[in-house]
């Protein structure tokens, strides 16, 4: 969002963030005619904690006669029925029912592969208390396994294409180094993993990302998933760190 990029303190100043949230609420209420509906559509979290819907026609849709908004905080879904679903207050009939239930971000796809490490642990077991790795790239006990834009790297909080390219370049340079020096295996140390995860979370705790908002950045949308802030905040500083390591 160009709007978000125009200010450098939205992620660290609650006052500045609240001003931005008020602006967003105002814009939504200008588009949605029914103010009670508009109020329900206004995000109740800090800006950036969860992604905004910035589609040009999304909010206009709620002005149509054949569209209604049901707040499941007020009317929890009870059951799926033969013709639709029922809430605590009413039954709704549909031609189609789309289940937008979210996704297991950053770790789910990797854990579904059931990767076996060299120390009898699977990746699921290694990450049982949250993703543990070094630079978001490599894990102890999993030699020559590299993750691209995974947890512990800027990934979803940066330009993803640029982040992918930086990771591929880093891994490629490492593989060339290994070949030139006759190395067959490479993995992070356990302590390097611990220190890196502490650094990732230490940076996040200085921002509003961890100020009580239950987002998928924390894995809060998945029941039972450890609540740990997964992305590294700050692409330039991350690249600088990777460059320092490569030059060492």
Residue ranges and their predicted role:
Residues 1-248:
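N-terminal FAD-binding dinucleotide-binding subdomain shared by FAD-dependent oxidases/monooxygenases
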């Amino acid at each position: 969002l160009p709007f978000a990029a125009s200010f450098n303190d939205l992620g660290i100043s609650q006052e500045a963030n609240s001003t931005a949230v008020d602006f967003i609420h105002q814009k939504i209420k200008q588009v949605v005619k029914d103010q009670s509906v508009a109020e329900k559509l206004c995000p109740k979290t800090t800006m950036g904690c969860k992604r905004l819907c910035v589609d040009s026609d999304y909010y206009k849709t709620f002005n149509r006669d054949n569209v209604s908004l049901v707040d499941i905080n007020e009317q929890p879904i009870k059951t799926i029925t033969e013709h639709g679903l029922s809430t605590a207050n009413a039954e709704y009939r549909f031609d189609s029912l789309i289940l937008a239930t979210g996704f297991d971000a950053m770790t789910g796809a990797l854990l579904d592969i059931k990767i076996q490490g060299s120390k009898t642990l699977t990746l699921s077991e290694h990450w049982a208390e949250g993703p543990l790795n070094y630079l978001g790239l490599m894990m102890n006990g999993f030699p020559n396994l590299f993750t691209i834009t995974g947890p512990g790297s800027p990934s979803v909080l940066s330009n993803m294409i640029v982040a992918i390219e930086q990771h591929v370049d880093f891994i490629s340079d490492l593989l060339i180094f290994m070949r030139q020096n006759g190395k067959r295996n490479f993995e992070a140390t356990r302590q390097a993993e611990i220190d890196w995860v502490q650094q990732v979370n230490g940076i996040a705790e200085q921002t509003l990302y961890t100020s009580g908002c239950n987002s998928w950045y924390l894995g809060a949308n998945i029941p039972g998933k450890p609540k740990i802030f997964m992305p590294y905040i700050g692409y330039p500083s991350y690249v600088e760190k990777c460059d320092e390591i490569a030059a060492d």
